[in-house]
Amino acid sequence: MKVIKHLTLFLLLTVTVNAQNIMTSSPYSMFGIGEIVTGLYGSNSAMGGVSTGMRGTWLLNTENPAGLTGLDTLRLFAETSAFMKSESYQSKNGNSNAFTGNMSAFTLAGRIMPHWYMAAGLTPYSSVGYYFQSTEPLEGSPGSYYTSTFEGYGGLSKVYLTNAFMLGKNLSVGVNVSYIFGNTKLTESQSSISVENRMYTHAFYADFGLQYHRQIGKETAFTIGDVYGYKQRLSIENSIAIVYSSSETEESKRNTTQYLPQFAGIGGSLTYKKCTYALDYDFHQYSSLSSGDSRVKFRDSHKLRLGFDYSPNGYSSSSFWKRSSYKAGVNLSTPYLQINGQKGYAYRFSAGMGLPVTNGRINVALYYDKTQLNNDVYGQSTFGMTVTYTLSELFYKLKL
């Protein structure tokens, strides 16, 4: 238990320090509550992030909290994730490139009592991170120009407590109770003056999950599940600061209204011999968010996720490669941003491996992400990697 204890203390400190760090470089993260963070953590990142119908003895599935009941009943788990990615942005106003990386999540999970499982953790919810400059002619002074600098950083983090219960041999339910919080700062600077828009956001939230799992013979099992989260108003405190070269004036602004969007999803997985196939469908009502700019609107998003896992011989094999697992996945979705009336499409391809290590597993995923709006209004291409380390230690000497 000492390994889990020391790792937990270190990672909680590390992830807390990094919770507000930049996880995106998109200029459109300035709108709403920032860019929604997805696909940057979890051992199933290589499978396209499928989760609704997924469960396993080493799978810390809090996306569908009911899936937590599939964990090994004798073990305590600690899991942390990190990522790095190279992003490229294209629009009619120009192109830009950026590289980002960070710790992205931490989870601690295990069984508390027979039929009762719990998890606690910290993950990012949204991120703001951009920097660009604009040069315009100075009115009334032909041949003269002024430069404006736009910069923003911050975002929202989610700390959560998950409870999952087995209602019978095949049926499980779960709930995530979360506190979402964070600060963002958006700055526009010209010469010796800058204007900072500051926003502090927080809210309590809950989402729910259900799974039905059934074993058919020795080599076949299937799981179906669904998830739901309601629309929740965010508490927001706005202020504006005007900063001169040697002074600063701050005053409160009229508070804006933003919401955590309602979402629902359904999914399933089928395990036959050494292979697992999974399919998820998700709906997020992002249209409840406000951008504050008439040119940029949020629209509802639909996402289809497919995942595949091949595990040759599981944990019992003496061969390292046969104890490894091989994963791939694909996402197809409608982007939640609409710019100048233009909609578009998004897709993601991912592949990776789950590697056995002493007292744990390391899951590595490589992915390519593409978002494109019509008429080349906006495009984003991302190539990245996520690494998730799951550590496990025996918690009970005897099964309860």
Name these PLM-found stretches.
Residues 2-5, 327:
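Basic side chains
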Residues 4-15:
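Sec-dependent N-terminal signal peptides
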Residues 20-400:
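Subset of outer-membrane beta-barrel
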